[in-house]
Amino acid sequence: MAGGMSAECPEPGPGGLQGQSPGPGRQCPPPITPTSWSLPPWRAYVAAAVLCYINLLNYMNWFIIAGVLLDIQEVFQISDNHAGLLQTVFVSCLLLSAPVFGYLGDRHSRKATMSFGILLWSGAGLSSSFISPRYSWLFFLSRGIVGTGSASYSTIAPTVLGDLFVRDQRTRVLAVFYIFIPVGSGLGYVLGSAVTMLTGNWRWALRVMPCLEAVALILLILLVPDPPRGAAETQGEGAVGGFRSSWCEDVRYLGKNWSFVWSTLGVTAMAFVTGALGFWAPKFLLEARVVHGLQPPCFQEPCSNPDSLIFGALTIMTGVIGVILGAEAARRYKKVIPGAEPLICASSLLATAPCLYLALVLAPTTLLASYVFLGLGELLLSCNWAVVADILLSVVVPRCRGTAEALQITVGHILGDAGSPYLTGLISSVLRARRPDSYLQRFRSLQQSFLCCAFVIALGGGCFLLTALYLERDETRAWQPVTGTPDSNDVDSNDLERQGLLSGAGASTEEP
């Protein structure tokens, strides 16, 4: 109908909102036509394997700099607070780009968007290995471009998995996918440190990654499909029929989704702690080793730091075990306990806080105990990665998931790990400036700057307790086969049934 001449838009089909008025002077928005789509199970698992491999490389890129941080500080002559700014620039560019990629992922080819991101971050990473010490600002800029490329993948890949699998299958696949967060982080430390030791030059660590990323790009193009949005929930029919919503309407819907809001704040607390620990823990452990007299201080590159290898191996081991334990606990208990997923997240974060505190305060006394409690804290923290992703996919309607992922990434990073490495380094530098210059005082300054992490992670546990109050309601709304803008789901289901707007209990949509 042209020019808004008709009083009502045509009904989009069974289960749709019937006879919506477009308003004066406005055209009817184009309906989302369901398209039949199917994929053999083995193809879905192959696609998931490729996405997991790329996620591994993604997180290796995040933390490879931390594995060679001492060398970078020596080459570019930067202090702790400016070194923390490296990660802050990376994460800031990631969070600024995430809403853009979330918007594109909800409306355009997700496969093409991810491919562009891989090209961007691999090219910037390779270029950064050739930057002269005179142009330290250019090195910071290159890390920002790597963060921009990484945003495309972090935002879109979970939504593709959400459209390939459903229910228990999706929980298990997400568990495997998110295992590669700690595995990739740990391998980033290991690769950076090991390549530096083998070649005597930290720059080669940044030149190895683009080769692996070229393979990832080819596999993505050849083996990963771009399923219709909501395909898993609608038995291959694609997105639930209805009208396309604007980005502002999507954001307004998500702002009313309290499970999403509180879980996002919980993820923010996790990001704050993992960002600070991931960037500074290897240096903290090295300085503890120097204080204990187990290793001499480093005066020139290459700096030998066995703690990068140890912390990397610890991150991998605790990450794999933690993600599996968290996902399996969620899969089992959500069938018998309402709101089990956020309760699992809350319990693990509240238990992480004392572990981190003990790891910090015991480091000057016994390095072994510090490692034990640090490993236990990382294990408990890792229990949440797959679970929080499953919470998001279960409480958000399919056509808004890309935007939801983007907003969660943006908020989580802007209030979390965008500032925590810089803030930790800044506090350390301020404390050190007021004390005599000694290795013990350097260590104590960094130790005390870490203490805020234990408090922040406890706040995150409280946010997940609040998530549990709203989870069942928001899950029910997300599974309602309602069309129109996402805000139309914000209606009581009994009222919808009385109005004849629900077509039945099934999630599939049929063409009229």
UniProtKB/Swiss-Prot annotation:
Residues 1-30, 481-512 are annotated as: Disordered. One of its GO terms (biological process) is lipid transport. Keywords: Lipid transport, Membrane, Transmembrane, Transmembrane helix, Transport. One of its GO terms (cellular component) is membrane. It is found in: Membrane. The chain crosses the membrane at residues 50-70, 84-104, 112-132, 145-165, 173-193, 204-224, 260-280, 309-329, 343-365, 377-397, 411-431, 450-470. Its main location: membrane. Pfam families: MFS_1. It is a multi-pass membrane protein. One of its GO terms (molecular function) is transmembrane transporter activity. The keyword Hydrolase does not apply. InterPro entries: MFS, MFS_dom, MFS_spinster-like, MFS_trans_sf. PANTHER family: PROTEIN SPINSTER HOMOLOG 3 (PTHR23505:SF3), SPINSTER (PTHR23505). Sphingolipid transporter. Belongs to the major facilitator superfamily. Spinster (TC 2.A.1.49) family. This is Protein spinster homolog 3. It comes from Homo sapiens (Human).
